[in-house]
């Protein structure tokens, strides 16, 4: 069928099942957007290119599908670099389609030219520069395959402007042939037999859940394994929701701001079953001492992650969609016996969990983060998707907000990108229109992409935005308070910005809570809004996130929290 390159892109997106595009137009993609217009293809005009790429990211995380975004050349696609890196660090499947200057202008420092392929090489799974229209169908087919297969990740397709204009006989390939890359990994079953044998020999096992369980959609299979073995569970930030937070022996998040029970379980276990996690430094603390008493079994699809940071005694390298069903099958005959074998250990870790709840305090004239999270939780459905920005509120959400389903907790874990949350929540809502979507943000993070408030209003996207307002960059402020002699350099925001007024000006119904006694009534009104809504809630400006493992310390060298910042058993339970 004869068509131009721009039309070929739209037809290819349809064949790949793409439902919506996030983007921002410009000179090199005008022909592409003209085809979007003629086709009436669903697209969202964001307020900034970073909003577009984070929107595609949130869509991908919530749905499990490939997110797609468009940008023009030069500053347009350069504005997406942070979002591409965010997706790369968290293994999120994206296809980023950017315009490039015309082929005869490439390499001449032309107007709005940037070598985006070179810029993004370290932060994409693969990228392409398309200078021949006949290559476009193959490249797009490969891009979607690479993005979603194996360990997912972002793929950039940079297309010269004249390629969009050129006409050719379009035919979309049915298969992908990439030499040396299959995208499907089945490991050695003998490694699984070793893992089962280690479980049989263990008396004090712990399961560490990572984001790989979420991205592979194997949470239900893993839940079956957990229920059979009745094994204590700890989670990474990215793995939150893979096992319901309400599971009896779920000890919470591990690592820098993990629970005492989770961190002490890792320190005291004799077997660590780590599934779909890459042992990030925020999880391990001092990696040389991480789970030092334990035999470590590491399940991961990416061979590069095996033994990269933490040495594993048994490594099961392969797709979790292959390995976890086999594991479930292999423990069927021994699971009940093993559950009994682990009974004393379960009791021990549960007692620690009860004795050392996450720290929280009630301060006059302010709403505590714990109270806010719990009151929000009461008002939303179990199926609600929670997004966060980055900072203290992110950790409080991980500690105090119970998530019971996979793909229902969206956060920037690897890169820690402030400004991620609002556009990601927008993308999640568009991908999952039947679900409630709630964003937790801080008064620092929300400013970074607040222009997307207008996008919510323009498209009537009913995200509910909860901003914890303390007038400071909370996590930076906390570190300065604890480790830099209270030198609050460049971390105090002040009280001049009225973000409720900003939201109102952008067409979003806004609320504010300055008196803690008003919280419940205002939250009721907030959640009753039909459409997007914004609420900012005053929290203590000097509140710290505890527990905390200082950088470079061992997991059992936690500051648990208290009025004097010393170890204490006071506080309020996380769950």
Which positions does each model-derived feature cover?
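Active-site diphosphate/adenylate-binding microenvironment
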Residues: 6-9, 14, 32-34, 347-428
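Hydrophobic, well-ordered secondary-structure elements that form the walls
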Residues: 296, 376, 388, 427, ...
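Glycine-rich phosphate/pyrophosphate-binding beta-alpha loops
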Residues: 26-29, 74, 91, 154, ...
């Amino acid at each position: 069928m004869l068509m131009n390159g721009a039309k070929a892109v739209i037809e290819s997106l349809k064949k790949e099942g793409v439902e919506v595009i996030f983007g921002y137009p410009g000179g090199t993609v005008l022909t592409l957007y003209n085809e979007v217009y003629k086709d009436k293809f669903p697209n969202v005009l964001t307020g900034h290119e970073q909003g577009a790429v984070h929107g595609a990211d949130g869509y991908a995380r919530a749905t499990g599908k490939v997110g797609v975004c468009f940008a023009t050349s030069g500053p347009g696609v350069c504005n997406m670099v942070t979002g591409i890196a965010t997706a790369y660090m968290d293994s999120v499947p994206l296809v980023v389609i950017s315009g490039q200057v015309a082929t005869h202008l490439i390499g001449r420092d032309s107007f709005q030219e940037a070598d985006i392929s070179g810029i993004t090489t370290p932060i994409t799974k693969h990228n392409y520069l398309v200078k021949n229209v006949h290559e476009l169908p193959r490249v797009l087919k490969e891009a979607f395959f690479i993005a979603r297969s194996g360990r997912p990740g972002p793929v950039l397709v940079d297309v010269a402007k004249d390629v969009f204009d050129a006409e050719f006989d379009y035919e979309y390939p049915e298969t992908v042939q990439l030499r040396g890359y299959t995208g499907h990994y089945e490991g050695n079953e003998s490694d699984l037999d070793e893992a089962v044998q280690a479980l049989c020999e263990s008396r004090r096992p712990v399961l560490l859940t990572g984001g790989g369980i979420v991205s592979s959609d194997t949470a239900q299979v893993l839940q079956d394994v957990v229920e059979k073995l009745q094994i204590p569970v700890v989670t990474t930030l990215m793995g939150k929701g893979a096992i319901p937070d309400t599971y009896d022996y779920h000890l919470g998040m591990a690592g820098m701001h993990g629970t005492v029970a989770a961190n002490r379980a890792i320190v005291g276990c004799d077997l660590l079953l780590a599934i779909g996690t890459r042992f990030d430094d925020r999880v391990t603390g001092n990696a040389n001492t991480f789970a030092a008493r334990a035999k470590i079994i590491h399940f991961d699809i990416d061979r590069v992650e095996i033994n990269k940071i933490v040495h594993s005694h048994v490594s099961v390298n392969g797709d979790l969609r292959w390995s976890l069903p086999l594991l479930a099958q292999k423990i069927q005959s021994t699971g009940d016996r093993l559950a009994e074998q682990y009974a004393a250990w379960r009791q021990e870790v549960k007692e620690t969990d009860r004795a050392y709840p996450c720290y929280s305090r009630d301060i006059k004239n302010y709403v505590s983060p714990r109270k806010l999270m719990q009151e929000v939780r009461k008002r939303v459905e179990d199926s609600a998707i929670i997004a966060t920005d980055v900072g203290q509120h992110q950790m409080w959400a991980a500690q105090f907000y119970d998530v019971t389903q996979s793909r229902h907790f969206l956060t920037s874990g690897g890169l820690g990108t402030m400004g991620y949350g609002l556009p990601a929540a927008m993308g999640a809502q568009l991908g999952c229109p039947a679900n409630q979507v709630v964003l937790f943000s801080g008064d620092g993070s929300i400013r970074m992409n607040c222009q997307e408030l207008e996008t919510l209003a323009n498209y009537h996207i009913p995200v509910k935005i909860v901003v914890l307002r303390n007038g400071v960059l909370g996590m930076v402020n906390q570190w300065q308070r604890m480790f830099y002699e209270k030198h609050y350099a460049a971390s105090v925001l002040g009280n001049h910005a009225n973000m409720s007024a900003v939201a109102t000006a952008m067409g979003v119904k806004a609320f504010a809570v300055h008196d803690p006694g008003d919280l419940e009534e205002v939250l009721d009104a907030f959640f009753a809004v039909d459409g997007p809504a914004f609420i900012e809630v005053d929290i203590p400006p000097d509140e710290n996130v505890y527990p905390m493992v200082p950088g470079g310390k061992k997991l059992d060298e936690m500051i648990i929290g208290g009025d004097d910042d010393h170890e204490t058993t006071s506080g309020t339970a996380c769950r």
